[in-house]
Amino acid sequence: MASFENSLSVLIVGAGLGGLAAAIALRRQGHVVKIYDSSSFKAELGAGLAVPPNTLRSLQQLGCNTENLNGVDNLCFTAMGYDGSVGMMNNMTDYREAYGTSWIMVHRVDLHNELMRVALDPGGLGPPATLHLNHRVTFCDVDACTVTFTNGTTQSADLIVGADGIRSTIRRFVLEEDVTVPASGIVGFRWLVQADALDPYPELDWIVKKPPLGARLISTPQNPQSGVGLADRRTIIIYACRGGTMVNVLAVHDDERDQNTADWSVPASKDDLFRVFHDYHPRFRRLLELAQDINLWQMRVVPVLKKWVNKRVCLLGDAAHASLPTLGQGFGMGLEDAVALGTLLPKGTTASQIETRLAVYEQLRKDRAEFVAAESYEEQYVPEMRGLYLRSKELRDRVMGYDIKVESEKVLETLLRSSNSA
């Protein structure tokens, strides 16, 4: 593949949030990036998304205009009981001072649009990435660094990035074996409601009108036992996004279906919703009554992988470490992957150096992403760990006080110093 002088040719599989972030990070280093995605982007997924301080910092480092995200400041996490009681509150008004950026809530489509803009903008830093839709990968030759698509065509590159999500195709070729993403037993109803639809109901003013403004987590008691001895893990997460004009709702619970035969994402009815959350306080049930276009979404976790890298092919984001959404760090970890990859492959990096740099990328990213995934899992499954993220400043500092750009630059400096002294 032809490449610009002192530039690598990069092929990214997946034009989701992680793939676009990787494209931005690599184009900013002067590399020539092509993005391939199996979809046509005719039906983008509408849902809210958490952007904690470490994630917002990384977006700024990639040159994103955060004003375009239409974010809503998450000033407080409020834990509430399913009976209507108010429990612990975690004040987040000092996050900007503590971490350099605030925590915001955004609409996924707004975030995707901004990443797309920065990746493809001809006026941006470095050559603009190019996007190729309706290209589904069927095969990746790791030795030749090529991919083959369903239309029979093959593309080669100096570097291939598998950012193709939790159902990744590239993962199988990196690991040289199939990896099963097991059923978690956890599922969530999710939907969006226009904020002004709440106006006729004063009992819902607490969601977007009354302080403290921020996300609400409405849970059943932490240690009740059901008839089969399983903890009741039902939780409803509510927050505003898109400049406060929309409210995102995610209602998490144990899945009664066989997840191995059920589709990962299916439409659901209001009757389905009330059957699970029928005993929640009337103030919450009123919100459930406003639900429309409900989707039932399986939450699966990619098991710890033996490696993320094989020669000049690497994994990034959910393809490597998809996790539960309990810490709001799923996208953030993929974004950190992208920033690290771009930092470790500056302009002037040669194709012969890629394998060494990717090994360093894996060393830098794998433990942290797996730690966050494990913490996210325990917050959902271990009763005494529920709410730990809100209670533990040490844990929050470890997760949100981390600056991937700074850490990547340190690693690169050490690597270059070692190479120069050899």
Curated annotation (Swiss-Prot):
The gene is h3h. The lineage of its organism: Eukaryota, Fungi, Dikarya, Basidiomycota, Agaricomycotina. Its EC number is 1.-.-.-. This is Hispidin-3-hydroxylase. Belongs to the paxM FAD-dependent monooxygenase family. Monomer. PANTHER family: MONOOXYGENASE, PUTATIVE (AFU_ORTHOLOGUE AFUA_6G14510)-RELATED. It comes from Neonothopanus nambi. FAD binds at residues 50, 108, 318. One of its GO terms (cellular component) is membrane. The chain crosses the membrane at residues 6-26. It catalyses: hispidin + NADH + O2 + H(+) = 3-hydroxyhispidin + NAD(+) + H2O; hispidin + NADPH + O2 + H(+) = 3-hydroxyhispidin + NADP(+) + H2O. Pathway: Secondary metabolite biosynthesis. Keywords: FAD, Flavoprotein, Membrane, Monooxygenase, Oxidoreductase, Transmembrane, Transmembrane helix.
